[in-house]
Amino acid sequence: MSWLYALETLRHAAPWLASIFSIITYLGGEAVFFAVGLFLLWCVDKREGFYVLSVSFIGTVVNQTVKILCRVPRPWVRDPNFTIWEGARAEATGYSFPSGHSQNAVGVFGAITLWNRKKRAVLIVFPILAVLVLFSRMFLGVHTPADVFVGAGTALLLIFFVYPVFSRDRGQRTLVSWVSFLLALSLGYLLFVLLYPFPADTDPANLADAQKNAWSLVGSVSGMLAFALIEPRFINYKTEAPLLAQIVKLLGGLALALGLKEGLKPLLSLLFGAALFPNAIRYFIVVIAAGLLWPLTFPYLSKIGAKKARTEHDEQSPSPTEGTRKDDQ
């Protein structure tokens, strides 16, 4: 705790730093992982998107399992005299060890770095972002160094473990088999948190949080399996498009996905009350909408900006008569 107390002193002396790191820490949150995964799937490379999402999904199962087994309380619970940055409290749910934000940041940014390791800018920028997220979790007081480094180390192992699956195009059958494995893993985790006889001192709120995450994972991966079965054969959308079209694809798709993710909450609560299983329904619908329905618009959206791009290309290309004159000269 001495390291955290030193950071607490610095935080009190320079609250503006805490404001900056409270923004940086969101880079390790679910929303950023969600947006980055969809951006890669829609606009960059479907294999890279599945790679990053797979690292994150397996990481979540491992992270949540270790959390609920170890049941390490947060720093301010272990030491009531310790204070945290209050703006970070709302996101600091569940047990402390290991850090989910740290694992997400290293998993997402590390996987992108390994995939694009020949690009110098990526090799510099993304590792720096990951390190900043790790430091932010400690600076804000919501995690200890052990929480952060174990979460980051787990993500690093998964980055290299999953990479061979997607390092080359292995076809639809391999993709379906891989996502089926992810679904089995998610179902195993769900059964564990529902049926395991946890000790009496297990915090009910933290256990409920683990069960909610398990249902969400099952719904998400079920949607991914539907994507793997249907998209390559019946949709097979192209990620390439003019820049303006890519922006519309990304912003429109995120609005749809996030709108469904948040909009379905009150409806499902009205239908099922406080039950946790509707989280599986909600995330399944979101993934189906994002992976199978929204891409149906891509052939039409790809026309946005295409005319301008062709015009600019034609203006830069020499006319046939100009080419003839140059040849004659």
Where do the protein language model's features map onto the residues?
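Membrane helical hairpin/interfacial module
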Residues: 44-76
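Residue-level signal for the membrane-embedded core of alpha-helical transmembrane segments
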Residues: 28-31, 53, 57, 103-107, ...
